[in-house]
Amino acid sequence: MSKKRSSPNRNVQIADQIQRDLSELIMREVKDPRIGIVTIQSVELTPDYAHAKVYFTALTGTPADTQEALNHAAGHLHNLLFKRLHIHTVPTLHFHYDQTIEKAVAMSRLIDEANATRAKDD
């Protein structure tokens, strides 16, 4: 007997819904002062929906403190998601700071430096 697998499209839809719901729940329900203005950038689900990597950026506070506070609130957020989502398994949440912006700025800076060096050599 074959196991029923969820489609990749369904996985994306559920991840998007979790992203939207978490954004709202963090803003309205989480009262930890270490969590300032947070943006949920993306959510990656395992195929069995058991775990979700939640990538965020923070405008206030340090990324480490914010990550610690979000992971501390993960159980509460999981329970709130369970009430909102209509799926059999609500994933365990694992929050990670999204370093994409910092890496892009650093890469851009390196490109600018390389171009400036090349211009001086010409």
UniProtKB/Swiss-Prot annotation:
Disulfide pairings: none
Example of a GO cellular component annotation carried by this entry: cytosol
BP GO terms, sorted: maturation of SSU-rRNA
Sorted UniProt keywords: Cytoplasm, Ribosome biogenesis
Name of protein: Ribosome-binding factor A
Classification of source organism: Bacteria, Pseudomonadati, Pseudomonadota, Betaproteobacteria, Burkholderiales
Organism: Burkholderia mallei (strain ATCC 23344)
Quaternary data: Monomer. Binds 30S ribosomal subunits, but not 50S ribosomal subunits or 70S ribosomes.
Localization per Swiss-Prot or TrEMBL: Cytoplasm
GO molecular function list: ribosomal small subunit binding
KW Cytoplasm (keyword) present: yes
